[in-house]
Amino acid sequence: DLFVLPTITFRILYCLVVMRHGRRIWLSFGVTANPTAEWISRQITEAFPWDQAPQYLIRDRDASYGPVFVQRLRAMGIRDRPIAFRSPWQNAYVERLIGSIRRECLDHMIVFGEAHLRRILGAYAAYYNQSRTHRSLNKDAPFHRAIERLGTVTSHPILGGLHHQYCRI
């Protein structure tokens, strides 16, 4: 799904987020000032290697998705499942991810440009997949973590201390 974000110079950046629903894994993201169907198609190709493509892709009916995008999905063997018009609740998992990105990360930072946003989202994606707990996953992270019972608990700041990862040594 796409979401927009203004920069410090009031330039609008578009971010495409791709996630796998099963364990809420944030697979990839892309940032651009001009999202075209070709650019979105390239992002999908990068998100899903040919041997790991999903059976379905749930998306909204944004005008940015065009015939080029649909053709790329068909070539990859992915069935396109657009949601109903103005019905974001039909794609609730990715909408929740976008809300988390905004509330837990981007609302606390000023973005300077595309490269800066990529660095921020890269760090937050690693935190989201490896450390952030999810209630729907019984307080586990999307990438399963082993539970350490012994050792000293240490804190590692993420995104300049906006979040912390706690682990035992």
Question: Over which residues does each language-model region extend?
Answer:
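Charged DNA-binding/catalytic regions of mobile-element recombinases
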Residues: D1-I169
